[in-house]
A protein has these predicted regions:
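Conserved PLP-anchoring active-site segment centered on the Schiff-base-forming lysine
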Residues: 94-116, 143
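Generic structural signal for small/hydrophobic residues in well-ordered secondary structure
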Residues: 22-25, 66, 78, 102, ...
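Active-site phosphate-binding strand-loop segment of PLP-dependent enzymes
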Residues: 130-207
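Conserved glycine-rich beta-strand-loop-beta hairpin in the small C-terminal domain of fold type I
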Residues: 270, 286-295, 306-336, 366-371
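N-terminal small-domain helix-loop-helix segment of the aminotransferase-like
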Residues: 1-83, 90, 274-275, 396-398
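Conserved core segment of the aminotransferase class I/II
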Residues: 214-288, 292-300
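PLP-dependent enzyme catalytic core of the Aspartate aminotransferase-like
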Residues: 72, 333, 341-342, 347, ...
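Helix C-cap/helix->beta junction micro-motif
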Residues: 119, 187-188, 301, 356, ...
Length: 398
């Protein structure tokens, strides 16, 4: 049985009532009219889209557009899903066996660890740690975890799951670290699943890593139009892999879920992918401007917050400095009772929502240190919300 999805339950409760969403991971979206304006001649094609079932693996033309994002896969090595979440559920249902070792970077988007756990896997966390001004995912720790697998005795290969750029920290491995991870997986015959939904939003494009499906025969790349493209409403995600047998097994599971994607969504997704450069450039600019504003804000308030700038993606993960003890303290009422009696991000989040209509995401939604909280960089309204927050903190004498 699946545990409650803490992050999604939090958003279900607050996302559509909060005035300012200062913690969302998707970038600024657009209307259908705006999307069609990028390719006016496509409007007739949308109007003539047949509203019957679509091909279960995805419209061939859409899969061809997706494959063009990669160097080593073609349209037959792409499997379209109704968003990335369905892809996660279907993939792990196809792959995971009772007692199999699944190593997952931590913290993580909950389904990356919870789905394997619910399917009977032995889930081992691979920890990101703040180290010398960056969030570090240590390949040496992965090597140790893979060694633990040797004693598992299930006969199934280990599965390594990582997310780059990382949610919620914005971490990115160096190319040398990435190559070491791939090499470790090759040596152990591990399947490497990489959640690449924030790819193309690297702060410095030179830090962009290859897609794992391009560099490793057992690599599986997961992506979606929700994040870098900002088109979450289309509900189009996909898996790309050289291992067609894995995609075939996953497609069999998909028959029990969505079966196929929405025909209008596939048509609109094709338009978006043909104009990826324009759409992603717009969202990259929004993220870059917001990152600069947040960096100034945290520099001015370094007595209150610890700040490690993200190297990529549309989220970051600051930490409260002030509060009782180590900052892990959460009072029973989940209320902020004063500067000297302790402060948790959950308590701060509650007060910001009640008084300002600003939504931040507490680290406890990642089963992590509650002094941390997630902020989002991809929305235009972030600057206005940050100004309001800054003024409010001044009024509190902080």
């Amino acid at each position: 049985m699946f545990k409650p999805f803490e992050l999604e339950r939090y958003f279900a409760k607050h996302e559509f009532s909060a005035r300012y969403l200062l913690c969302t991971s998707d970038c600024e979206s657009m209307s259908i009219r705006e999307l069609l304006s990028l390719e006016p001649e496509a409007e007739e094609g949308l109007h003539s889209t047949w509203l019957g079932y679509t091909e279960s693996r995805g419209n061939p033309m859409l899969r061809k557009e997706i494959a063009a994002l990669y160097d080593s896969v073609d349209e037959d090595e792409v499997l379209v899903h109704a968003g990335a979440e369905e892809a996660i559920l279907n993939l792990f249902t196809a792959l995971v066996r009772q007692g199999q070792t699944v190593i997952v970077n931590s913290p993580c988007y909950q389904s990356l660890s919870e789905v394997p756990r619910a399917l009977g896997a032995r889930v081992l966390p691979w920890h990101l740690r703040p180290t010398e001004g960056r969030w570090f995912l240590d390949p040496d720790e992965l090597a140790e975890l893979l060694a633990i697998h040797e004693g598992g005795g299930t006969g199934a290969p280990p599965i390594v799951v990582m997310n780059m750029p990382h949610n919620p920290t914005g971490a990115i491995l160096t190319r040398g670290e990435f190559d070491r991870v791939v090499s470790l997986c090759e040596n152990r015959g591990a399947i490497l699943v990489c959640d690449e939904v924030y790819r193309f939003l690297e702060t410095d494009p030179r830090d962009r890593l290859p897609a794992v499906c391009d560099v490793y025969e057992n690599g599986i790349s997961l992506s979606v139009l929700s994040k870098a493209w900002g088109l979450a409403g289309l509900r189009i995600g996909w898996l790309a892999a050289q291992r067609r047998d894995i995609l075939d097994l996953t497609a069999q599971v998909k028959d029990y879920n969505s079966i196929c994607a929405s025909a209008p969504s596939e048509t609109l997704a094709g338009i978006a992918l043909r104009h990826s450069d324009e759409i992603i450039a717009r969202n990259w600019d929004i993220c870059a401007n917001n990152l600069a504003a947040f960096s100034r804000f945290f520099a001015d308030r370094e007595d209150m917050f610890e700040w490690i700038p993200p190297r990529g993606g549309s989220v970051a993960f600051p930490r409260l400095r002030i509060g009782g003890g180590s900052g892990w303290w959460v009072n029973a009422e989940r209320k902020w009772t004063g500067k000297d009696s302790g402060l948790s991000a959950a308590a701060l989040a509650e007060r910001l929502l009640e008084e300002l209509g600003i939504l931040i995401l507490p680290g406890i939604c990642y089963d992590y240190d509650p002094a941390y909280f997630r902020i989002g960089l991809g929305r235009k309204q972030a600057g206005e919300a940050l100004t309001i927050l800054d003024q409010w903190l001044d009024a509190q004498g902080l």
